């Protein structure tokens, strides 16, 4: 279990997940948190990462750094998504092991599970079927990271754990029109349509896919909880256990943003995986419960978007 003065490194502290973990750690009284910006430490450079771990010797590591994006970003940069994510994961995990890190927590994604996996998806369904093609590169990279943690545990007795979150949203999200995920993309799209007085907004696909969403501060709470209370080779799913269709989501976001025009659907665009709902029974049996309902979380996320307009340009 982490002490309040344990040296804790959060990789990716400027991203949505990493910044939420830092907030949660500070909220709980941890006072020796180490972070580095990309300019200070390029996680793709093995030499630099090894030098950082050799000098700092963090006792605990939260690996929240990743190259992320929605369907468009993933499909247009398959090689980049695979290379960048595998390299940064391996550099951090391997350097942590070489320098005696007590415990590491790897943040993955629910996209690691098969496209047509039985719902809700249990942790053990990993590698039992074909992946969703629109984010296959990212999924394979994340699978590599969690498997490397598992293999280090099995071969060297390390205590490295993996968490697989569902779709995330909340403060410090990425609202870029080309690189964002569905929920922040909808927030931006409906906000701009409201400001510009557009009569209609067009969304991808037909609205039928079912999705689950978890507020990022709830994930951060789980991450700290697991670092202190869980060890094992099995991954732990992070979600709410609740789902809604993309059609229902667009209607909810439009109402919260205050857009009252019509919503149209571009059937030439891909839907992605038809359904993604995580089985979160493992996390709940450990004693964790999420706190933020979707409508409340979207209101908080929209306010964060309004308070920080520069995020829309990332």
Indicate residue ranges for each PLM-predicted region.
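Active-site Tyr-X1-5-Lys
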Residues: 133-166, 185-196
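Adenosine-cofactor binding site in Rossmann-like domains, unifying the SAM/SAH pocket
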Residues: 26-51
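C-terminal substrate-binding subdomain of Rossmann-fold SDR/epimerase-dehydratase oxidoreductases
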Residues: 11-12, 16, 20-24, 28, ...
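Conserved catalytic-site region of short-chain dehydrogenase/reductase
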Residues: 71, 106-121, 137-143, 155, ...
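Flexible, glycine-rich beta-alpha linker
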Residues: 112-114, 137, 161-185, 209-210
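NAD(P)H-binding glycine-rich loop region in Rossmannoid oxidoreductase-like domains
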Residues: 46-86, 95-98
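Short-chain dehydrogenase/reductase
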Residues: 82, 86, 134-146, 176-184, ...
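Conserved Rossmann-fold NAD(P)-dependent oxidoreductase catalytic core, especially the SDR/UDP-sugar
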Residues: 4, 90-135
């Amino acid at each position: 279990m982490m002490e309040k003065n344990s040296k804790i490194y959060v990789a990716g502290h400027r991203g949505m997940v990493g910044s939420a973990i830092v907030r949660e750690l500070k909220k709980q009284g941890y006072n020796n948190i180490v972070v580095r910006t990309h300019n200070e430490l390029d996680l793709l450079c093995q030499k630099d990462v090894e030098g950082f771990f050799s000098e700092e010797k963090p006792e605990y590591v939260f690996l929240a750094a990743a190259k992320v994006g929605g369907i468009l970003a993933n499909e247009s940069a398959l090689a980049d998504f695979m290379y960048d994510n595998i390299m940064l994961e391996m550099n951090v995990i391997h350097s942590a092991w070489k320098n005696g890190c007590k415990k590491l927590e790897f943040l993955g994604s629910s996209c690691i599970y098969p496209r047509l996996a039985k719902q809700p998806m249990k942790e053990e369904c990993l590698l039992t079927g074909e992946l969703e093609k629109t984010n296959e590169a990212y999924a394979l990279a994340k699978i590599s990271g969690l498997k490397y943690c598992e293999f280090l545990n099995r071969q060297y007795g390390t205590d490295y754990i993996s968490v697989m979150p569902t779709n995330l949203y909340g403060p410090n999200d990425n609202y870029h029109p080309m690189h964002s995920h569905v929920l922040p993309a909808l927030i931006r799209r409906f906000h701009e349509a409201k400001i510009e007085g557009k009569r209609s907004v067009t969304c991808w696909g037909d609205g039928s896919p079912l999705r689950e969403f978890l507020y990022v501060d709830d994930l951060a709470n789980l991450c700290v909880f697991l670092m202190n209370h869980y060890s094992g080779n099995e991954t732990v799913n992070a979600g709410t256990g609740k789902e809604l269709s993309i059609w229902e989501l667009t209607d909810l976001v439009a109402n919260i943003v205050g857009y009252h025009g019509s919503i149209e659907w571009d059937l030439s665009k891909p839907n992605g995986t038809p359904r993604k709902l995580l089985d979160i029974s493992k996390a709940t049996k450990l004693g964790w419960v999420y706190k933020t309902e979707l409508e409340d979380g979207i209101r908080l996320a929209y306010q964060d978007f309004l308070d920080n307009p520069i995020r829309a340009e990332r």
